């Protein structure tokens, strides 16, 4: 299935690229979420008319993500959790908890933007957590977990 990308898609291409994908990926993900359109003559002409508008929207999203990344770079978030004598938490700190703490600190962050490659946090300590704000913009935040 040949499609025209309407935005940058990870591991696939950039805005305006013509790509060949499997039919299921196109029908079930790219087309319904507005990330692509079918590559025919009418859609190609319509895309070329809207290209400047789409590029401006993509640049605005990236600029917004970069400003949020600059705010996050200065932040250090402290999360209090109940823990045992040896520093092991009763429960865990996940992406939702970190996103809530960052939002409370004044920077709007969605749960899906927080990346914990080693899984949830289960020990008291300091952690560097990646926040994926845009396909080209990633920030690192220091999260300090203390025992209550």
Swiss-Prot record:
List cellular component terms (GO): ribonucleoprotein complex; ribosome
Taxonomic superkingdom: Bacteria
GO-annotated molecular function: rRNA binding; structural constituent of ribosome
Q: Which UniProt keywords apply?
A: Ribonucleoprotein, Ribosomal protein, RNA-binding, rRNA-binding
Can the keyword Ubl conjugation be found in this entry's annotation?
A: no
Biological process terms in GO annotation: translation
What this chain does, per the entry, is described as: Binds to the 23S rRNA.
Family indicated by similarity? Belongs to the bacterial ribosomal protein bL9 family.
Q: What is this protein called?
A: Large ribosomal subunit protein bL9
Species of origin: Pseudomonas entomophila (strain L48)
Encoding gene, per UniProt annotation = rplI
């Amino acid at each position: 299935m040949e499609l025209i990308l309407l935005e940058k898609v990870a591991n696939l291409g950039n805005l305006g690229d013509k790509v060949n994908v499997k039919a299921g990926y196109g029908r079930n993900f790219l087309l319904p979420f507005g990330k692509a359109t079918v590559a025919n003559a009418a859609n190609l002409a319509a895309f070329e008319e809207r290209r400047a508008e789409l590029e401006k929207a993509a640049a605005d999203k990236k600029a917004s993500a970069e400003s949020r990344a600059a705010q996050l770079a200065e932040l250090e978030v402290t999360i209090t959790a109940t823990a045992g004598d040896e520093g092991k938490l009763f429960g865990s700190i996940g992406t939702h908890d970190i996103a809530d703490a960052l939002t409370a600190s004044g920077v709007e962050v969605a749960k899906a933007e927080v990346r914990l490659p080693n899984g949830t946090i289960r020990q008291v300590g300091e952690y560097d957590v990646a926040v994926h704000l845009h396909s080209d913009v990633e920030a690192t935040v220091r999260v300090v977990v203390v025992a209550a």
